[in-house]
Amino acid sequence: MSGLKEYNGCYCESEYEYAFIGFLEAEGWEYSSGNNISRVTKRDILIANDFKKFVADTNLDLTEDEVTQIYDSVRLVGAETDFATLHKVYNWMVNGIQFTPQDGIARMIPLIDFKKDSNKNIFRVVNQFTVEYTNNGQKENRRPDVLLFVNGMPLCVIELKNPADANATIYDAWEQINIRYWRDIPHLLHYCPLACISDGVKTRLGTVRTPYEHFYAWRRVNDGDAVSTLPFEETETMIKGVYAPERFLEIFRDYIYFQDSIYDSDEV
């Protein structure tokens, strides 16, 4: 769908966005514009069709109404704090959500299939996904640059800055996610533990609660590879090393850690 396009010897932000998406497509992600995704309102965060298809395809005994009940349980999640809600949803994503179907026997319903070589998961990269919120009684919106959905749930938010603008830094991208998005659209970040920030030269991975200084550069795709040093090479290395679908799920499941609440820390 997209590739690196040169723009007067450099890259503008919109073309970098589509180049980034093109790299993800090459790794196996399916591209959709947020403008073409069916939602009841722009406050809706989940992609209902993908979520329900995965649950139905992996639980053939469930009725359509039961699948909708599971969807509503995840869609209407609530907890005492933003951090607690994020932790609760992450636990569902990794371990499944408990549900009692019409036979009366409670069981765990997986929301992601972590089995090696699974072909059940739906990997979707989305841009132009407008998220609505209310500010002093007025409807406003935010539009993250790129979101990565697995089975209709946005597991990673990606914020990109113009590689041609020396004043646009990855710190600005970090502030956009970890400050402004938490302030305005926390209902998106409740489902979205991972965060990536990039300006083409520097690309870093963290979580939506990670301090800026702890965001991590992915230097190699595999052990023994040469360290990436060229512009855009670091981006490609991050995408191949982190976002190849099977590897992405492994990182998502095994490398996200929530601090114990007794230490009064909301870091992930």
Summary of predicted features, one role per range:
Residues 2-268:
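ATP-dependent helicase/translocase motor core
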